[in-house]
Amino acid sequence: SHVKNIISAFVRYAVDEDYISKDFTRNAKTYAAKESKRSDLKFLENDELEKLIQSVKESDATTSHMILIAIYSGARYAEIAGLTKDDFDFENNTININKSWQANDQEFKATKTKTSNRVIDMPHDIMELAKSWTFGERYAFESTTGLPPTNNAVNKQLRRYLEKNDSKIITFHGLRHTHASYLLSKDIAIQYVSERLGHADVNITLSVYTHLLDKKRSIETQKALDELQKL
């Protein structure tokens, strides 16, 4: 229905902005949409992530390149699909997020929020690998249609890798959560992670990754008590 389409559009926006973790309208019937829960948030564990990276690096498929960029940048699908070759700065090892690809309209549009426009620092070896990729003239990542691969296409490719590696199944958007979860698990400051993700507010990051932060808090509490005990 028209109303469901409007609701779905808002939900997709909320997922992109990480206000919620899952598009609960995707397979929902009109009369019974389920609410999203934080427990639906899925991300790869470190061993699963390492296996995925190894598999992706061995492929020259455009969808594989997009997966690799998602892993190391934490960018959204629309942001990665919206990249052009000029957005890759190989001298400074950065990618410039300044627009997004809108598949329905088949055109570039502004990013979701002002803070979504950002320059993301990338690992040197990943940018060296990207130098060998063949970028399209209009889009960095072009499929045989001359347009960026669809969200469905990159999700299918990702699923093939995960199934082959016997890893948990996540979506392409789940790579964004994996990126953030990995950095937070390595004690990277949440303010920096929030900026890297392009969140409008650090509170969004705090709310999305509360499960990880609660776990880290218990560890930090014990460390603090151990230090205080030495006084």
Specify the residue positions occupied by each region the protein language model found.
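Conserved tyrosine-mediated DNA breakage-rejoining catalytic core shared by Y-recombinases
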Residues: K29-T30, G82-S132
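Short, basic (Lys/Arg/His-rich) helix/loop patches that form interaction surfaces
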Residues: Q54-S64, S73, I120, F135-Y139, ...
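N-terminal core-binding DNA-recognition domain of tyrosine site-specific recombinases/integrases
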Residues: S1-Y19, D23, R38, L147-A153, ...
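Catalytic-site neighborhood detector that most strongly recognizes the C-terminal catalytic loop/helix
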Residues: W101, M127, L197-K223
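Basic, Lys/Arg- and aromatic-enriched nucleic-acid-binding interface segment
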Residues: S1, N5, D16, I20-Y77, ...
